């Protein structure tokens, strides 16, 4: 009997609880729709998943843009440094044969025009005549003057070369279009520029024999303290190094026309300058040569876009046939860098 009473009591409690929940549900369903919407528990109790996504979104908005702009700013500074750092140590503007865009190469007119364009240095071609006189002349220029595509400076005597120069002067109606000797050229330009490059050409009939001695002799006679001698012939470069410790010497890096392979970058230890054919120049090459305390000169750069590229590579000198255009490009880049906020170190 007692067990039956307990069972009834249990069912009675469960029934009461069920009825209470039922009545609460009924009251809630009878609330106006507007009050149900404003129910605080519905309004302020988002699901955990929604809350998590909201938190992730807010974190993304707070963190990603500053990081993005930080890296963009860093990239901008790196690009600006690459583009503008040369302003702290500008390269020499080296006039190839003088201003050979506006005058015939290696003539007094070309040298005078280069000096007027504020070139820092002038490159003079050095070739030896049949009778051993050094002329400021390249074989290709002799061929143009003579009209003979096979002419070489070493095939002609001093008198013959001077005769061709006189005829060339008459054709151009200028007293400064004749062919100068290297001594005449050095006397004219060496005190007007920071550096003179003597680009020594090896040719018949004696080739390298005695050429280093002849070049050093004219350097000494003209007292050219700012002369740099370089050549494509490593034998000649080594001869000059062996005979004199006072003259700055360089060697040439280019692609061997026979093998298609670039010359060894570090092949002459005592040479202080390396003249590099401009398509070969990049940051890695410049870094390698700088680590060996060698200056990097590019040749021959006449295109304005390539001039800019050489500036960005931070080399020491740019050899060009058009020094005026190079000066204009340098000024344009300088102006843009300063407008972008680059600070030149003093």
Place the predicted regions along the sequence by residue:
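Phosphate-group recognition and catalysis centered on beta-loop-alpha active-site segments
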Residues: 2-346
């Amino acid at each position: 009997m007692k067990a039956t009473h307990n069972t009834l009591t249990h069912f009675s409690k469960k029934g009461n609880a069920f009825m209470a929940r039922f009545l609460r549900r009924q009251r809630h369903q009878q609330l106006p729709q507007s009050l149900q919407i404003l129910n605080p528990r519905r309004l302020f109790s988002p699901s955990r998943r929604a809350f998590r996504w909201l938190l992730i979104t807010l974190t993304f908005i707070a963190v990603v843009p500053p990081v993005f702009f930080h890296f963009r700013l860093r990239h901008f500074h790196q690009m600006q440094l690459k583009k503008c750092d040369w302003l702290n140590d500008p390269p020499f503007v080296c006039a190839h044969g003088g201003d050979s865009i506006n005058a015939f190469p290696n003539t007094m007119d070309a040298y005078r025009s280069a000096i007027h364009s504020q070139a820092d240095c002038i490159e003079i071609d050095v070739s030896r005549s049949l009778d051993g006189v050094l002329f400021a002349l390249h074989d290709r220029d002799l061929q143009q003057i003579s009209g003979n595509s096979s002419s070489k400076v070493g095939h002609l005597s001093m008198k013959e070369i001077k005769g061709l120069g006189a005829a060339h002067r008459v054709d151009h109606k200028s007293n400064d279009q004749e062919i100068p000797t290297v001594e005449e050229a050095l006397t004219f330009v060496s005190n007007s520029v920071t550096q003179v490059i003597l680009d020594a050409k090896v040719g018949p009939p004696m080739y390298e024999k005695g050429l280093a001695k002849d070049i050093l002799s004219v350097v000494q006679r003209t007292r050219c303290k700012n002369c740099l001698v370089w050549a494509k012939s490593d034998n000649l470069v080594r001869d000059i190094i062996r005979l004199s410790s006072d003259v700055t010497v360089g060697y040439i890096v280019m692609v061997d026309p026979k093998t298609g392979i670039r010359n060894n970058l570090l092949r002459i230890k005592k040479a202080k300058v390396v003249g590099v054919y401009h398509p070969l120049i990049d940051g890695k090459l410049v870094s390698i040569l700088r680590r060996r305390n060698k200056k990097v000169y590019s040749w021959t750069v006449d295109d304005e876009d390539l001039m800019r590229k050489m500036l960005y590579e931070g080399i020491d000198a740019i050899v060009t046939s058009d020094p005026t255009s190079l000066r204009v490009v340098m000024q344009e880049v300088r102006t843009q860098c300063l407008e972008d906020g680059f600070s030149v170190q003093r």
